[in-house]
C-alpha cells in the first residue's frame, strides 16, 4: 500500500513538471522556471 502511495506522488510530480514545460513552450520560452519545476527536480535548460 505504501509503495502505491509513493508511485502516485511520483506520477503527479511528473505530470506537473510536464505541464509546466508545455506552458513554457507555448508562451515562447519566456517564462522563468516555476517553483513546481524545481520541486520535481526537472532541470530547465
Curated annotation (Swiss-Prot):
Gene Ontology BP annotations: cytolysis
PROSITE patterns in the cross-refs: PROKAR_LIPOPROTEIN
Membrane disposition: Lipid-anchor
Xref: InterPro entries: Lysis_col
Alphabetical list of Pfam families matching this protein: Lysis_col
Keywords annotated in UniProt: Cell outer membrane, Lipoprotein, Membrane, Palmitate, Plasmid, Signal
Covalently attached lipid (S-diacylglycerol cysteine), positions: 18
UniProt entry tagged with the keyword Phosphoprotein: no
Main localization, broad class: membrane
Subcellular location: Cell outer membrane
Domain of life: Bacteria
One cellular-component annotation, GO: cell outer membrane
Signal peptide: 1-17
Lipidated residue numbers (N-palmitoyl cysteine): 18
Summary of the function given for this chain in its UniProt record: Lysis proteins are required for both colicin release and partial cell lysis.
Protein name: Lysis protein for colicin E1*
Gene: kil
Amino acid at each position: 500500500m505504501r509503495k502505491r502511495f509513493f508511485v502516485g506522488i511520483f506520477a503527479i510530480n511528473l505530470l506537473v513538471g510536464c505541464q509546466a514545460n508545455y506552458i513554457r513552450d507555448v508562451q515562447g520560452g519566456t517564462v522563468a522556471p516555476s517553483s513546481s519545476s524545481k520541486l520535481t527536480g526537472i532541470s530547465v535548460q
